[in-house]
């Protein structure tokens, strides 16, 4: 029903599933993603938070925080789901810091240095071996924070690159850019993701944008796909940073020096958005719930612009619009100079 854009019928079907199986977590979770897709965020997060029964799922002997006062208390915020999900919801950690006596963030290893180098007012760890359950009054999934806090509003940027890292990449890019607009690119996500076929673009199709003049194309694509960039022609206008992107702290150092990031729905897009960097996100006809429907702006990331497929599976028209917008941006930059 959703793919046929029959939203009223879809809502009725979701509610029917919840009524038939009120204890079925998947039914409540699905209703939550439906409301989030429609932009009904507060309602959506409340239902989305029912995706797991944390008392049963969390393996440490710490009470799960359900909301409410944290005054004088210590709380463990733990990671859940993918890198993009965590980058999205780390925006709410500062609010918890203001509420609690002590905060510890348990995060995936590739994100840890990014947080530590920001010198945050909380502890960062990457393993349960670093934790003692007796130290904490409460625990809460980072991805549950939107459902527990009184407002979804948060300050952006909330992530940034360490100054030393930023300066290292400034020097590297300065040698290559020669006055060109510096644009970072990501065209493919994790191939193991259930929606990857829908969200990723083949490099052969994506590289058509490289015909736009006045741009230094900076490769932020990691994994198997990065080899395609290395094999591309016109080396004078291509800068391959991917081989040095060992973690998100390194990627943040590159992004901090770019004029724009163009990406499909991946963790890099979340990182750029969280840093307040101008980001153009390329979305399939049926996007993930957080990008909502039809709008070109983004509630979560003010500096992000959404380019959506208008025909299912057709990226060519999207890339044409992006190329046109890029040409305008280059011309505007040249006029200013």
Regions found by a protein language model. Give the residues of each.
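Alpha-helical solenoid repeat scaffolds of the TPR/TPR-like class and their adjacent stem/linker regions
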Residues: 1-260, 265-337
